[in-house]
Amino acid sequence: MWLIAVAIAAAEMQAPALPQWMAGCWESRSGETWTEECWSKPRGGMMIGYGRSGTGGLLDSWEVMQIELAETDDPAIDPITFYGAPGGLNRTAFSWVRESEPGITFVNAGHDYPQRIRYWREGRDLIVEVSLSDGSKARRWRYSPKGN
């Protein structure tokens, strides 16, 4: 029993880390419709990403993203922040929240939609879910490694 308590305490005390398991290019296809998301490997406390969607050879939408690790012990500063800018506009910050679910979750309850962004892996696939902060109005994408 004591070992379980020690293991739980150690897990809770682990420092936040950038989600290196997201690095790479990911793609989802359904007929002519496609969506892709690419993330750099962590470097210098940051991951840089982009997403784009389209049909055939036409681009429908795009977004630039960033995940930043703050090098601070100040509890007033979010240790990890996700930034998204659909179409390169209105860059919005989402704060990392510690959850028991696998993956990484970011929340900004003051944003219209999405308010919650969650990434996790299932086998080789990268799963992304966006929703309101209570989990309602969820949309989900399942990406496979691009080129496979």
Which role does the model predict for each range below?
Residues 91, 101, 120-127, 131-148:
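Edge beta-strand at a domain terminus
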Residues 105-125:
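Short cationic/low-complexity microdomains
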